[in-house]
Regions:
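Helical element adjacent to the flavin cofactor pocket in flavoenzyme catalytic cores
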Residues: 134-187, 191-194, 199
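Active-site substrate-recognition segment that forms the wall
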Residues: 14-15, 43, 75-77, 202-327
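N-terminal Rossmann-like FAD-binding beta1-loop-alpha1 element of flavoenzymes
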Residues: 1-24
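Glycine-rich FAD pyrophosphate-binding loop
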Residues: 17-37
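C-terminal catalytic lobe of FAD-dependent flavoproteins
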Residues: 296-403
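Dinucleotide-binding Rossmann-like beta1-alpha1 core, especially the glycine-rich loop
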Residues: 40-120, 252-254
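Short hydrophobic core segments
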Residues: 2-3, 190-203, 207, 347
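Helix-loop-beta segment of a Rossmann-like dinucleotide-binding subdomain
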Residues: 74-84, 111-157, 268-273, 329, ...
């Protein structure tokens, strides 16, 4: 039983079904209609430390490239690369140092000049001729709605079941006779399962509390004024044929192409929360469109199509939380920032832990560098277990980077 049909939950459910298990996926709304729908969906390991967490994310990049051919990747996988610009003295120094650092770890990253940037992205309008420009050719973005549609289709084609709405909204979690995990839904059903995996994003702490394990999944509070978890997502269009084809980051804006001839826009300095008035959201959205017009070509006819506050799940120590919960060992959780980057790889690791007897090849198809032992704890996940928070007062150390 998998709770939550965002990109991580759908990936986990599809991997487990592919490993030969009978899987039910529960979703209170419709698959892919929550946080994943509004994600910037930037697949990267750019500025993610320490080294083991960088390596986990780098493996996530490779995992999507490996999975794409099996899931009609042309519909959702965009290995476009990322251009990042820095204009201040401190920004230029930081970007140059980061590129050198990442390259030393074997991550594709290099500094380029304005001429090469123009060749890579003809739509780019350089804000400053003295800008430092970095090129990250291995990075990508995903169209999450199309991706999740294909993950769910693959799940059901392998015998999986998807329950949505009241049938998929979890209202209780406990164990029955023989300590069998049970999930109660808003439709009144009580469903037994051998394993329950919670991939419910920011709702995971509340579900952990239902299972009697309150406080074991510390996320940054996302529903209070001033929280760093919410971000403003703006989509604009139509975009002309001369518009951008790659991810672009500047100090003022982050943007990428989106489906339907739109651009997806975000910015680090647009503080919003779930209490921000609609009039302020519209003002900020218009501001982001003007910034985008100063950054890329193709937006002469564009207008704001959507402005949405997206509340992201941010673990308190900014690292993934994956594994069985202290106090409710029958409940397995997987919650992380960078869920889009990590979903393909984390789901593979989780399937290896929860599918004993699964042939090794089924878990590592297309990934010969990944060493997994089905049914055994994953060494790659050892640092990310919920138990690390036991007896601590975990808290976030700074604003979310969005990376």
């Amino acid at each position: 039983m998998v709770i939550g049909a965002g990109v991580l939950g759908a990936s986990v459910a599809e991997r487990l079904a592919g490993a030969g298990l009978q899987v039910t996926l529960l979703e209170a709304d419709q698959p892919g209609r929550g946080t994943s729908r509004w994600s910037f969906a930037w697949v990267n390991s750019n500025d993610k430390g320490p080294r083991p967490y960088h390596d986990l994310n780098h493996a996530g990049i490779r995992a999507w490239a490996e999975l794409a051919p099996d899931l009609i990747g042309a519909a959702w996988y965009r290995p476009a690369g990322n251009l990042e610009l820095a204009t201040s003295d401190s920004g230029r120094a930081e970007l140059a140092a980061r590129v050198e650092h990442l390259a030393s770890w074997g991550y594709p990253a290099r500094l380029i000049d304005a001429a090469e940037a123009a060749e890579l992205e003809p739509a780019l309008l350089l804000p400053d001729p003295a800008a430092t420009i970095a090129w990250f050719p291995g990075e990508a973005y995903l169209l999450t709605e199309a991706l999740i549609e294909r993950l769910v289709a693959s799940l059901t084609s392998q015998g999986g079941t998807v329950l949505t709405g009241e049938q998929g909204r979890v209202t209780g979690l406990d164990t029955g006779p023989g300590d069998t995990p049970r999930v109660r839904t808003a439709a009144g059903a009580v469903i037994e399962a051998d394993e329950v995996i919670c991939c419910a994003g920011r709702w995971t702490p509340a579900l952990a509390a239902l299972a009697g394990a309150a406080g074991t999944v510390p996320l940054v509070t996302w529903d209070t004024p001033g929280s760093p978890a919410p971000a403003l997502v703006v989509r604009v269009g139509p975009v002309g044929p001369e518009g951008p084809v790659r991810l672009i980051h500047t100090p003022q804006i982050a943007l990428r192409p989106h489906s339907g001839g739109l651009l997806h826009l975000e910015a680090p300095d647009t503080p919003v929360d779930l209490h921000t008035p609609e009039t302020e959201l519209r003002r900020l959205a218009g501001q982001l469109l003007e910034r985008a017009r100063r950054t890329v070509r193709g937006l002469d006819q564009a207008r704001v199509v959507a402005a949405q506050v997206c509340a992201r799940p941010l673990p308190a120590d900014e690292q993934s939380i994956v594994g069985r919960l202290p106090g409710a060992e029958w409940l397995y959780v997987a919650v992380t920032h960078s869920g889009v980057t990590l979903a393909a790889h984390l789901s593979r690791l989780i399937a290896a832990e929860l599918a004993p007897g699964t042939p090794h090849a089924q878990l590592t198809a297309g990934a010969p560098d990944v060493q997994l032992t089905a049914g055994a704890p994953s060494a790659a996940l050892a640092a990310y277990r919920p138990a690390r928070f036991a007896g601590t007062a975990a808290h976030i150390t700074g604003p979310a980077t969005g990376r």
